[in-house]
Amino acid sequence: MNYPAVAKELLTLLGGKSNITALAHCATRLRLAVADEQKIDEQAIDNLEGVKGQFKVAGQYQIIFGSGIVNQVYAEMAKLTGMSEMSTNDVASAGAEKQNIVQPAVKGLSDIFVPIIPAIVAGGLLMGIYNLLTAQGLFIDGKSLIEANPGLTDLANMINTFANAPFVYLPILLAFSASKKFGGNPYLGAALGMLMVHPDLLNGWGFGGASVSGNIPVWNILGFEIQKVGYQGSVLPVLVSAFILAKVELGLRKVIPSVLDNLLTPLLAIFIAGLLTFTVVGPFTRDIGFLLGDGLNWLYNTAGFVGGAVFGLIYAPFVITGMHHSFIAIETQLLADIATTGGTFIFPIAAMSNVSQGAAALAVGVMSKDKKMKGIAIPSGVTGLLGITEPAMFGVNLKLRYPFIAAVCAAALSSAFITMFNVKAQALGAAGLPGIISITPDKIGYYIAGMVIAFLTAFVLTIVLGIGDRAKVGKKAAA
């Protein structure tokens, strides 16, 4: 290979020397930050000798040459640009400056969730198995598998316990990972997560019913009442609290003498962060969720299929924050007055969103040539179809962005469809394929049609959006 010639041509295809703001390389890739991405001729670069792929990530433009070759190309590029003293960190910093506010936020969420994906995937698959065992009428008319085979009852109960564990104690996993990401001690983060799911607190999933009945337990401290409510399965309160904990910890370490650091810093950090969690962060984020839920209730009842489309479009972003748990209170009220309401409209729309996210992840798994990404995408997609979308969203769809876009568009379309036919659920369950048994009998056909629309739209749209960027699908997981 004529390295000087390749480097010279590559520089031209990148828009010239003036378009390169940072240059470095790793073991296999040339890493750059550019002033204007529109000046890059990606198609011509794909056909350049030695190039094995290219993709954009975190504001950086990366070209894959392979081990050995990249060093030679970089050396020639450095001569042409005069950028021979830069590191990959310099390129990352330059690339970060080009990112909008959404990109680093999405990357940060991905960095936090990716390490805990195996636990969530395991729980999701086990929950799907439990739903199949306990779903009435799914395999046997009028009965579930465990009703037909009582000897399987305890097995189903055991599987349910295994399945719930990662979600009940999600704040522990999440706080550990988030604290590490925010620069704090991850074990202090885990302690904060344990505090948020302590058994002395009202179970977070029981808050909706307790708020309706007015039986929310409180701590009464000098006349000031603090709700004793847990945050099982929550995301946003945990992320905010972990961020506060990390910053408090780092701040304390700067002012507390080293001789007292190991004693006072953990004590004060946990106390301050815990107090703020139960007095400000938790109630505030939960109230936001209730306000949004009330707004969606109004939207559905007044805007018809348009309201259904909007709800379907934004349901997945609610899942990202954990605010979708606030809908349980609304659904409880809707089901309590089922003679008047006809059931809950939230469950079917949630199912459309979940199926869409699962289908998008499966499409990535089909497209991907990278074994690691395929190994994450396919099982995550399956759990999404069964009603558990966190693995698909955080491990695949948000990380690549365009599968998430495809999924929310599919959710909007399918939600509009089922809203036109007033599809509602008469019970709660797994919001996905097993959710068929929860739908009012005369609307099951429309529910199935909606899931088909959701799946096909998300799957096809993901492939269409990803065709021009296959390198991202196959290589971004390793970036």
Swiss-Prot record:
Instruction: Give membrane topology per the record.
Output: Multi-pass membrane protein
Q: Which GO terms describe its molecular function?
A: kinase activity; protein-N(PI)-phosphohistidine-sucrose phosphotransferase system transporter activity; protein-phosphocysteine-trehalose phosphotransferase system transporter activity
Q: Any one Gene Ontology biological process term?
A: trehalose transport
Q: Does the keyword Transport apply?
A: yes
- Primary location recorded for the protein, binned into one broad class: membrane
| Record text about domains | The PTS EIIB type-1 domain is phosphorylated by phospho-EIIA on a cysteinyl residue. Then, it transfers the phosphoryl group to the sugar substrate concomitantly with the sugar uptake processed by the PTS EIIC type-1 domain. The EIIC domain type-1 forms the PTS system translocation channel and contains the specific substrate-binding site.
Function of this protein? The phosphoenolpyruvate-dependent sugar phosphotransferase system (sugar PTS), a major carbohydrate active transport system, catalyzes the phosphorylation of incoming sugar substrates concomitantly with their translocation across the cell membrane. This system is involved in sucrose transport.
From the Swiss-Prot or TrEMBL record, give the protein name.
Answer: PTS system sucrose-specific EIIBC component
Species this chain originates from: Vibrio alginolyticus
The gene name on file is scrA
